[in-house]
């Protein structure tokens, strides 16, 4: 095998020339952006063939990994049932299936939440949707949401058959399965039924894949006649919403990464545009949750880590329905080390999600006075200052555990439902009955052939190079492993958009753990693990903190002798792929192998082009290099594609992408791979650079359980081979 056999895309200067802030760059490979060009598609196919050839020595290991993923999968994986109206809705995925099946069972048979098992079916259960049948003949298939009507007559579900996250909504008769409507396409995320189950609202995306319109659709009508209820003209903002537990209100948000506003839609008057309730304010984020007779809101007007407040409902017929912040009643403000994040409200209680000690936590609040309903509508609360008790913690014992409140279904339920998991703890759902104080386990994901007691999971804190910042790290390894400097290691990171990379269970990690690989999740700045301040200390002009934190954790793994200096694998996806490119440019000899999934490695080109999807909104994350020379210079110094080092040996790299990815275009990693091969002093047999492209998929990669297994097994086998694990 020689490097010359790797596909070479010719350089074509003049395709994209950049001159800005005194800097000039002529991009020789930007022509690969032309997806309709036969030369581009031929090149992509050639790269796939080359990757297959390079990975042949690891093919047996990849096949073994798929078999092991299969062995760790229970005969049936199921969800905890959720109540909507008079039915319990749930799903199962059988061992032999790539996709789930959706069911329901009458609540008349099961007044309390039914507990599913691997071997038993429920009395009177009905199959609503078999995704496996729907996926037949499709190269890519994904169901987004399935939403039943309150009366149980209809279900609506969204599907994507391209991987571009432009959804088609399908409405079926729940009893017969007959399709009634599939006219709504090019939809974004979000769906809510009108109270009469005759119509629904959804979001529409523009050419830049921004959710910019709120639409109202009558079931059975032509989608061309759908009503526009709300439009967000500012390209920095996206509209989003989800159905509420509260049956009388749905909150529609418009948010950027720093601020937002909110509107209130009435399902009983579905054709009426939503009323504004919270006006946008610079640098103030809001997350509003309806609670029947008032609203709850998490906002950042008082603290960047969040405050919890009550908001009165806007008065009917009032000319101005925006609620003055002076009338908000503060219930709680984040303490040091906390970050308030989300709400889930019911008639008699609500749950508050927050972060503390780099982990998701939760507490619940009980209502002190009953909700009053007159003529089928809630009476607005005149005073909510003493409407709620002090919060009670829901957190589970354990050093490392991610805990999330889950919806139980009905607004009138007195059931607090939480899910929790960790790298070693499989997903578990528990339900607390507030009437009795008793709790019970609704679901524990079974994992055959796996004993978590053979491993240990701990939190360590790594001192950053500034000598005072403490970086949290989740460290997992075999219980019998010692820090003797011999082990292979695998470090994961993300560090952008205030997204938290929490310790969660994934059977795909298990084969490497059983082979003695030490796993580390670096909870670096730019992510949300330690709150808003942690995020802001890793964006815009201090973005490089994200990269140096990751390198400091990687160096710690070697210096502490948990990992052999030549056996460390690094992995990141999307913005985490930018991280992979930046850290390999900075310290290429630190890693033996790098997996860069859908990597954002041509960041500067993208952020300089407002016509590309998501770019305008991204300026709040990265800064605006068009207007700000300092931001331009900083991004120019770290964008991976433009900073590959000449004549230096890099680690083995596998980049993956999808031709239909709307978030990170396939062209970015393809350009990066060409530049890496041209500039670096690689020894192909020892440290190959390859790229695999899914021809029908999106940002999340291949669809279907087994499709994902096969794709990930190829990545894992490639990386493990580089650190001497070949079986």
Name each model feature, range by range.
Residues 108, 173-177, 218-222, 266-270, ...:
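Short loop/turn segments that connect beta-strands within beta-propeller blades
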Residues 7-49, 66:
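Mature N-terminal segment immediately following signal peptide/propeptide cleavage
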Residues 121-145, 156-159, 163-204, 208, ...:
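Asp-box/WD-like beta-propeller blade repeats and closely related beta-sheet repeat scaffolds
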Residues 166, 204-207, 211-217, 226-227, ...:
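Beta-propeller blade termini and top-face loops
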Residues 232-319, 324-325, 333-335, 341, ...:
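Long hydrophobic segments that form regular secondary structure
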Residues 521-727:
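Active-site-proximal cap/loop segments of hydrolase catalytic domains
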